[in-house]
Amino acid sequence: MGDRNNDGDQKMEDVLLPGFRFHPTDEELVSFYLKRKVQHNPLSIELIRQLDIYKYDPWDLPKFAMTGEKEWYFYCPRDRKYRNSSRPNRVTGAGFWKATGTDRPIYSSEGNKCIGLKKSLVFYKGRAAKGVKTDWMMHEFRLPSLSEPSPPSKRFFDSPVSPNDSWAICRIFKKTNTTTLRALSHSFVSSLPPETSTDTMSNQKQSNTYHFSSDKILKPSSHFQFHHENMNTPKTSNSTTPSVPTISPFSYLDFTSYDKPTNVFNPVSCLDQQYLTNLFLATQETQPQFPRLPSSNEIPSFLLNTSSDSTFLGEFTSHIDLSAVLAQEQCPPLVSLPQEYQETGFEGNGIMKNMRGSNEDHLGDHCDTLRFDDFTSTINENHRHHQDLKQNMTLLESYYSSLSSINSDLPACFSSTT
């Protein structure tokens, strides 16, 4: 019978030991291993050795352990420092173990029942007053005390230690030194080639930079749209009507990604006569080119020569581009011209603007000169001011038609005498 038990133990050792790693959880240490030790129910295989660890320094304990590579486990009796005290004696030959906090409860995974207690301790070299902290750590596991209190005489003299407090499982390990890790990491970084360090820095800078991408722009919103044209659109010379460049809405508020732009239109760099002409918003109708108007110094003779011919004025007003005046009114808020355009201006024809009132005061106060360049393409018309401008042109025509009757009342600046 005994031979069969020995054969069974030998087979169990052959099965468990090869490749075996002992990494129990806190619950397994308390509920299985420590509980069996307190109940005097040992295992057939000695995985945790019984040893009074306080008789040795922590750096000497790994050689006594049965298992473990970085953690070593021991059954340790809880001897009391004093006869009538529950405080254990944790003094060794080279130092002492000091608790870092209170006991932490260990709960069962099946419920909220406390099945054990865990305490953390640190080893100090030297005596209590001048001890030097080391990297050696210990976790002490023990069972909770019995709920039934015993009489004082029996507790302190006859049986000072309860069965649950008689044994503890101690896990010994050495904490990784943070200073050592910092030194190792510094030496590793310094040993890297310069190219690697440079690439790392460039990648960090690149990751912190916002990029804009034109191909990831959403559809334009209904507000804050910027209109631009494609200046590279070819133009056909055979067509009678000038081709209107394609105007596409573009919103700077609808970016979904911040990538670097690849093709971004810059209106300032491409600012020229054709670009300024096509910036004006308008309808699609084509306006004929109006004849050249006399300059400001030719107005007196022009008025005298045409005072008796009202048909010319009618033909003239029918060819006046009403949107030209509108374009002048809309030009300042639409575009800001470069410095060279502001200094030189646009050379072109002059027309009389907003002729209202009567007699010489009206004629002298409201004569203004508009200067435009040669408009070869269409100038679009703003629908909101269209009716007002047509009324102004009607007043202008009626005023010139009545010049024959008021020729004698003209001011001296419009007389034919020099």
Swiss-Prot record:
It is found in: Nucleus. Its main location: nucleus. One of its GO terms (molecular function) is DNA binding. Residues 16-175 form the NAC domain. PROSITE patterns: NAC. InterPro entries: NAC-dom, NAC_dom_sf. It comes from the Eukaryota. Residues 115-181 bind DNA. It holds the Pfam family NAM. The keyword DNA-binding applies. Keywords: DNA-binding, Nucleus, Transcription, Transcription regulation. Expressed in root cap stem cells and their immediate daughters. Induction: Repressed by SMB in oriented-divised root cap stem cells. One of its GO terms (cellular component) is nucleus. Disruption phenotype: Fewer root cap layers; reduced number of columella (COL) and lateral root cap (LRC) cell layers from late embryogenesis due to impaired periclinal divisions in epidermal (Epi)/LRC and COL stem cells. One of its GO terms (biological process) is positive regulation of asymmetric cell division. The NAC domain includes a DNA-binding domain and a dimerization domain. Promotes periclinal root capforming cell divisions. Activates expression of its negative regulator SMB in a feedback loop for controlled switches in cell division plane. This is Protein FEZ.
